[in-house]
Each structure stands twice: as structure tokens, then as C-alpha cells.
UniProtKB/Swiss-Prot annotation:
ATP binds at K583. One of its GO terms (molecular function) is aminoacyl-tRNA deacylase activity. It catalyses: tRNA(Leu) + L-leucine + ATP = L-leucyl-tRNA(Leu) + AMP + diphosphate. SUPFAM superfamilies: Anticodon-binding domain of a subclass of class I aminoacyl-tRNA synthetases (SSF47323), Nucleotidylyl transferase (SSF52374), ValRS/IleRS/LeuRS editing domain (SSF50677). It comes from Dehalococcoides mccartyi (strain ATCC BAA-2100 / JCM 16839 / KCTC 5957 / BAV1). This is Leucine--tRNA ligase. Belongs to the class-I aminoacyl-tRNA synthetase family. Keywords: Aminoacyl-tRNA synthetase, ATP-binding, Cytoplasm, Ligase, Nucleotide-binding, Protein biosynthesis. Its EC number is 6.1.1.4. Its main location: cytoplasm. The gene is leuS.
Amino acid sequence: MAEKYNPQETEKKWQDKWAADRLYHASEDSPKPKWYSLTMFPYTSGNLHIGHWYAEVPADCFARYKRLRGFNVMRPVGFDSFGLPAENAAIKHNIHPRIWTLNNVENMRRQLKTIGAMFDWDREVITCLPEYYKWTQWFFLKLYEAGLAYRAKAPVNWCPSCQAVLANEQVVDGTCWRCETPTTRRDLEQWFFRITNYADELKDHEGLDWPEKITAMQRNWVGKSYGAEVSFALDCPTAFEKEIKVFTTRPDTIYGVTFMVLAPEHPLVEKITTPENKAAVDAYIKKSRTCTEIERLSTEREKDGVFTGTYVTNRVNGQKVPVWIGDYVLQSYGTGAVMGVPAHDERDFVFAQKYHLPVITVIAPSAYDGKPLEAAYINEGVMLNSGPFNGTPNTEGKEKVCDYLAEHGWGKKTVNYKLRDWLISRQRYWGAPIPMVYCEKCGIVPVPEKDLPVLLPEDVGFRSGGESPLKYNEGFVNTICPVCGGKAKRETDTMDTFMCSSWYFLRYTSPGYDKGPFDPVKLKYWMPVDLYTGGAEHAVMHLFYSRFFTKALRDMGIIDFGEPFKKLFNQGIIVSNHQKMSKSKGNVVTPDNLVAEVGTDAVRAYLMFVGPWDQGGEWNDSGLSGMSRWLNRVWNLFTEEYTPQTASAEAERELKRTLHQTIKKITMDIERLRFNTVVAALMELSNSLAKLKETAAISAENWQNTLQTFALMLAPVAPHIAEELWANLGMKYSIHNQNWPTWDEELAKDEVITLIIQVNGKLRERLEMPAGISEAEAKETALNSERVKPHLLGKTPVTVIYVPGKLVNIVVK
């Protein structure tokens, strides 16, 4: 054996060996229970950073552990490779997005292999390749056939920097999720998916082992509200419509309506605005288009509006109500119209005060004196000024008013959602083309399945301005209508890249299958994913879309399950000097340099040790150096000659106890994904073994068995050095095909425990006692302790509490 450990040489040797042997190839023919381990695949930005490693390494440790526990583990890998950065790079560097992307794939593939993960490279997927996006287009057609894909003109989020449309989920605090530029609104013909059809299912996480923060974010994003849809009579000579509908969660306040507010985008605004108010309304609409939805909804921003000149009639009391427009109302929520009840809504109260609109109290506490309100009353109370409902508790009034409205045909109970349909079309080149054509005779026509994929053309000119480069490629645009054979034009928008990542986990089950998006037999074997790991930032984008996609495919009969991921785990982040790593701060840690310096296993072990996986930790170069030194000590523990002297029964017992306690702890901690304490336990064990080795009181056989067990527990954390040590022990290749060690509960028990003695909860004594001490013996020992007796003088013990093996608490008075 080598005297000095050379991590780079050893790691390359075993990585090459594992690859040549296809050691980590997962087969559906295995008699073992399956385990599908998946980490969110990386975007092809060009280089892996330490955050990628932090996502992959602990997940790989757990996958390796499951393999040793007898599971047939699949851990696939791939690349999310469509998207805006590639197109921006094409414009900036005058390079084709395909070339830029595939160069990045090649580099990142090399980097991923240095992690030493048990990736099954036979299952690699790259979403920008035609053999993948052919099936992305196929899914679009299936969604279209099912009525879940549609085209409509709608106000959309626009990023002026990216020159692209954004889905609602991609706007964060009024800014673009990618570049943080403030977004604006535009009216465009767009393609949408009816994700709202699945609103109730998407807020239900029954049976899933997901973090509560993620399920809460998804429930809040769906935003389910119970209320009523109420129609107000409209008598306007310039409008064909005879009513305006509003959604309200407070039907009990219907008698207090003193104004109505429409969203600036409401289709009736233009029709009902009187000539004398048109200039002011037009100016207000123009101004509102410069505001983001976040700004419009902000509670800090002053609410304003403009009068249209038109009135509606509140049918429950015959009152004429002025119709205003205000940008704090969104067309995308409810009906795009709200009833103003200033007496019982804080926002409406401020609006009414500003524009001198009436305030009518219709809910009041029992002691209400009839004086004008100085602020909106939003608590429960009794209905007044409410016709037949006077004296009714408003909690009952909600239901009664709904029934009353329904009886007269003026309204109905309804449920509303904050969730909007998924906007999936993008005016960019580097994405999967939407497989639709436009024929003057036949209208919108889907591309036949036999003609898929609709390929991206290679010869395109990239330009800014917000229009797809495909629009100017005549060879792509001009085509033949599949129905009538006449001239037609292709859709030039491409799909949101989240479309590609909404099903990639299905493709991993059979990536080479060409008769469909996946082999149904293999899909049934592997799905759903048993453990999915990745960042919490994907809660209302990727994770949300993937769940919708899975449920839609289930309803179409393509798959037979409704949830893609059984268990979800979100890792924390690695910071440097208490700051998130970024190029601008100059604190980015490059894994390539670290591997060259200390080797992969040291980086792996340090990342797992740096802090709880769900919290992350502070990067420290000295900590990494310390981890490297520890692995060298482990190497020396195995490779330096051991010559036993006379075996000691006491030393043998101590060895077995320490070993079995460590097996138990590491097993339980890995199951809980607590990798930092796993590494700490391995360190403690190596220190204990080093001390026992010095005594030379362990038999050669027991020492050999102990080293084998240690290597097995080290294998998920540091797979390369563990494989090398295993081979050096003369064991059968590969360590990663062995069985995880088990512990004996009896052997793991301590012979001696430290018993804490308290009096009224205060520590008074620590005693070393036999591990098997009985409750009676523990209590008697505590009461008779010389250091405890002074605290009992003149006092009467009320009770003595015993926590087995840990403490005795004497309660006195």
C-alpha cells in the first residue's frame, strides 16, 4: 500500500473503474425494492459552483446509503438547457445558442463526474436536443386536445431588460426573477395552460412528505377564497351589457356599497366612460400600465382612481352607485370589479375619504351609538341599514344574503382563486417551438404528431426588441396547413423552459425510448420519485408546474399517478463571510480548484460537515484543510501496521460498544438527512479507534472487522477513499455493492451512565452509575448523595422524578 494518500490519483482511478463497469447503472430487472433519487437538474450556465455541489453531494450520500441498505437505486442526471441566458450569450458574443449550450454541457458533465456521484450516465437527458423536445411538443398537443392549452389576448408581464414575457410566478416583488429589472404590462396574444382547473388539487398535499413552508407557499399561491358573485344593474346607452358582476368575500356588507371600482383593463371601461370623462380615464389607464401588480397591490401605496361618469344600481336597495376605475383592482382576480364598502374595508375607507364618497355603516357592535365612523369597522357585529337583515349577526348574514341574492337571480355563492393560468409562450428563439400553425381557411391547427419534432432552424438572426427571431425566418414560418394543404404560417413563439423541466423526471425512466415520451412499463416501475432535492425557490414555479403536469397526464390516461415526488427536501445555501456567494462580491468558491488541491472526498465530507443540510453554512478554507487532514489520518489508521499484543477483554468490549453505538447513530442520522452529525460521528469513531490501536489490545480479527465496518460507513460520505481502503483490506470489489452494517442493541448499551441529580430543577450532583440501574436504586442513591443531602435539610420531598438512564429530580418544599 502507498505510504501517503494521493486523493487525485485514487479518485480518478476509481471514477474510471466505476464508469467502465457501469457500476451505477440501474436496471428494472433487479429483485431489490426500487429507490428513485433525484436532485433538480442544473441549468447549463457554464460552470458548476459550490452551490451545485451542496445540492448534489448529501443527496448522493443518501443514495449510496440506500444502495448499501439493499435498494435498487436510480440516480439520473441531465441538463436543463433551453432558456434566455443562451440567447443573450448569442447576442453578446456572436455565438449560436446551441453551440454555447452544448459547450457548457460538455464542461458541466466533466465537472459533475468529479463529484464522484453514483450518477447513471446512461440516462442523461439534455432538454434542448430534438429527441427530447419532440416529446415536449407532443405533450403540448395532448394538453391542447384535452382543452388545457388555449390562446388568448391578455395583459402579460414584460421584462424590458430580457425583452421577454414572464409568467406571474416569474415576477418577484415587481421585478424579473432572473435579472431583477422592474416589469411592466403589455397586451399580447399568448398561449396558456389551464392550471386553474387543478387549483384545489394543487393546494392539497395529502400523503406527501414535503416541508411545511413549501406546501404553505403553494396553498397561498392558489389563494382560495369563498364568497359571492353579485351583479349590479347597468343602464348605459353605449354598452350592450346590462350588468356588471363583482366578486366579494363580504356579501353581508352589500347594503353598504357606495361605489364600484373596475380594473383599468376591464373590457367595459371603454364602453361605459362618458365623453366628458374620457380624457381623464385614458390618462389614468396609461399611467397604470407603468405600474407592476406588486406596486398596484401594495398596502403602502396611496389608492387612487378616476370616475367614469356612469352609475350602476345596487339591486338589493335600489341605490345608484358611481363606477370608478382604480389600479388597485386587478382584472386577473375575480371579475376585475369590486364593490366599495368604505364602512367595513380599510382600503375602501381611504378611497372614499379621498374622493368624498358616502360611508354607510351596515355592521356594528351591539353598543354602536350611530355616530359616523372614524375608521373602517372590520370586526364581527350586527347588521343594520340592511333591510330585512337588520339585527342579524353578520356571521349568519353572509349565508342569508347569498341565499337572498340567489333567489332573486342577482348573485350566487362562488369560490375564487388568486391562481392564474400558466402563461407558457415566449417571444424568444432558444426554446421548444410551439407545434401550431395558422391557416387563413382553417384557423389554428395543431401540427400532426407524425411531423414532430418541429425543429428550430439553425440560421436565425438575433435582435433585441421583444419579437421572436423565428418571426423573421421565412423558411421556418411559411409552411403547409395539415388540414387543407394550403399556405399557413407557424407559431413563432417558443415554450417557457419550465415546460421542459415539468416532465424530465419521467423521461429519466427510459431516455432512449422512441415510441413515446417514456416506456410505460419502466415508468410504472420507477415512478414516483422517492426523494427529490433542490432549492426552495422553486416552490411556485418548477414544483408547482410539475405537479400540474403530472395531474393533467393522469387525467388524460397517460400515467396512473397524480403526484411526481413522494418526499421533498430543500437544502440551505453555503455563504462566505455571511454573504451569499456571487461573482460581484468576489466570494465565489470554484469546486475545480478545490478538487485539484485536496481531492473530491475532502470537499464532499466538508460540505456535509459544514452545517445542517436544510440550513447551509459558512464556507471556511481552514475547515476544508482540516477535513483533508482527517481523511489522511483515516488513511494512516488503515495503512499503518497493526501488531496486536495480548488481547484485552475490556478493550474488546469498549471497541464493540463504540462501534455499535456509532453504527446506530450514523444509521439514524442518515435516515434523518443529518449529514453533519454523520461526519462528526465518523470523526469521533476514528479518534476512538486510533486510541484503541495504540493499546494493541484488540485481536487482529476484530481489528480487521472493525476497519471493514468503518470503511462501509465512510463509503457514502467519501466513496473513493473508502473503495481504496476496502480493496487494500483484501475485500471483494466493490464496497458499494456490499451491505450496510447493523448494530446489536445490547452491544450498543453503555456499561456506565452519568446520572444527573437535581433538586427543584437545579443541578446538585453528577454520578457515574451502572447502565442497568433500576428506578428504585437510582432514587435511593440520589436521596443519599452527600452533595444532595444539604439541599434536603429542613424540607420535605414531595415527589422524586426519574428519567431512565438520565436524571433524578427531587421536588421539595
